[in-house]
Amino acid sequence: LGRAPEAFEGAVGGFQFLDGAMLEPKAMLLSEIMSAMNFTGFFFPFTGEANINVNAPDCFIPCTAMHEISHQRGIAPEDEANFIAVLACLESGDAEFIYSGALFAYLHLGNALYKASPEAYHDVAATLCGEARADLDANNSYWASRDTEAAAISESVYTGFLYTQG
């Protein structure tokens, strides 16, 4: 997490609206509770803190940090924060962040592709390297083990909150 603010600066060069204070994301002590609620991170606007669930699979923590830094820099919509997070990861020059951003992009684009064409999705998925496949499998297992009624309620409430925010 300590490298995240500096890594984020790679995206700022081309997009001055992303410029801002270099605040380090905070590892949450209550990460297991965040996992139970299906949260990988959240931005707390009253303190300006980007809070990260450090119990979530390691492969997505750098991209999650970039997502929350996007919120710190004024990007409110979740899909836009996701886009900026991937951009920042890919422009960071840091192999760990680049991998995390690419894997996150694959996850979201793969889900969209699967809805449009399961056959095309399977063709693309077959090209993944073993490490990426293992990380995605570990991510799926992690979240499946936390698929509870509390998680469903939390997700429903948060989704409702996001809709009220536009």
Predicted regions and their residues:
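Auxiliary, metal-adjacent structural segments of Zn-dependent hydrolase domains
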Residues: 1-54, 58
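Second-shell loop/turn segments in exported
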Residues: 51-55, 66-74, 95-96
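Alpha-helical scaffolds flanking conserved acidic
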Residues: 59-63, 80, 97-104
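Active-site recognition of the HExxH zinc-binding catalytic motif
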Residues: 63-82, 86-87
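Short helix/loop segments within enzyme catalytic domains
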Residues: 86-118
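C-terminal amphipathic alpha-helical segment
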Residues: 111-127, 131-136
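Pan-zinc metallopeptidase signature
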Residues: 128-166
